From Swiss-Prot:
Function per UniProt: Responsible for the release of ribosomes from messenger RNA at the termination of protein biosynthesis. May increase the efficiency of translation by recycling ribosomes from one round of translation to another.
Keyword Protein biosynthesis: yes
Subcellular location, record wording: Cytoplasm
Keywords assigned: Cytoplasm, Protein biosynthesis
Name recorded for this polypeptide: Ribosome-recycling factor
Length: 186
């Protein structure tokens, strides 16, 4: 294993932390409707839990309404129940075989709560990135101990890992700021 391997490994894991943050932030509801809001809703489909996208078409009706059309008519009740119980603050209404899910406007208080949640998610991602930096630095120290690299190489590798960490922390800050702005925009 070389310094480049340690750096590449750390970079890949840090990128996964960013992807996880993006996924978590997408679940946080803003004032506008988007189909990703229901991505993690699980529906009881003949005894097994499956994502809503596997049993229904999820579309945007307008800026504040999501339309859900189950492929099987008898799944309408199960899908509606799953959306209601998903703890998203949504209240679906069934019209025939189409479920309309209006997204209520966020109150100022709820917006502030959501920005705290967003900042918390950002902090968790930063902690993950910093832990990956620590792991990479420990790997570099182990390589020096095993005499696979010199101390100068370790120092250079540590500097490169720090630059990576700074880059990913800046990206996390940017994502959090964008989501905050999206939430606070009425």
């Amino acid at each position: 294993m070389s310094v480049a391997d340690v750096k590449k490994n750390a970079e890949q894991k840090m990128q996964k932390s960013i992807e996880a943050l993006k996924t978590d932030l997408a679940k946080i509801r803003t004032g506008r409707a988007h189909t990703g809001l229901l991505d993690h809703v699980q529906v009881d489909y003949y005894g097994s839990m499956v994502p809503i996208s596997q049993v229904a078409n999820v579309t945007l009706v307008d800026a504040r309404t999501i339309g859900v059309q189950p492929w099987e008519k008898k799944m309408v009740q199960a899908v509606e129940k799953a959306i209601r119980e998903a703890d998203l603050g949504l209240n679906p209404a069934t019209m025939g075989d189409i479920i309309r899910v209006p997204t209520p406007a966020l109150t100022e208080e709820r917006r502030k709560e959501l920005t705290k949640v967003v900042k918390g998610e950002g902090e968790d991602a930063k902690v993950a990135v910093r832990n990956l930096r620590r792991d990479a630095n420990e790997q570099l120290k182990k390589l020096v101990k095993d005499k696979a690299i010199s101390e100068d190489d370790e120092r250079r590798g540590g500097d490169e890992v720090q630059k990576l960490t700074d880059k990913f922390v800046a990206e996390i800050d940017k994502l959090v700021a964008e989501k905050d702005k999206e939430i606070m925009t009425v």
